[in-house]
Amino acid sequence: PNTFCILAMPYGSYSTKNMAIKNASKMMKESGADAIKLQCGKDSVDIISAVSAAGIPVMSHVGLLPHLVHLYGGFKMQGKYAEDAINIIEDAIAIEKAGAVGIEIEAVPAEVAQEIEKAVSIFTFSIGGGSAGNCQLLNGYDLIGGFNSFKPKFAKRFGNVADVATNAFKEFVSEVKDSSFPDLEHSYSMSPSEISKLKQYLESKSKI
């Protein structure tokens, strides 16, 4: 009850104002979330405004927008150059003016995130934006080391589940190959009397 839950709307579910209001309303009702989050900036403030005007607490996203990662050529830091940084800051300002209650800042230089925090008065949380923001966010799989092949620069691993999982699969394959698994401990069995009944039945069927 004391946790503020934000529900990220799926890609393509808020392409128009009417679609955004309809889907956001449904998702809020069904999930019990406290707010919904879109991934759009100043080019889509009309959608943010429409959702907000419908009485739905809405947040948005600046910097790296995962829904648009194909436009960046991959998961890459945004705002490296001053011109790009200005656009990101302007996005944040426009998002606030459109009625959003908060902004996620993702994968931007710490200096840019700090300027965003200065430029807006709404709630901010940062993932890959340095120490700026009202709170810090990390994806669970990054935090526990769920992947070996993909690791964002901003993600510190507090565990290494990937190695544990990989070793478990290797042991499974090895034991299957040498027939040590499955063993009696990990197998179901019938009582001797039931086995006898089964064999008698099968033998009688084979004689027909």
Regions from the PLM with identified roles:
Residues 1-208:
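Alpha/beta enzyme core
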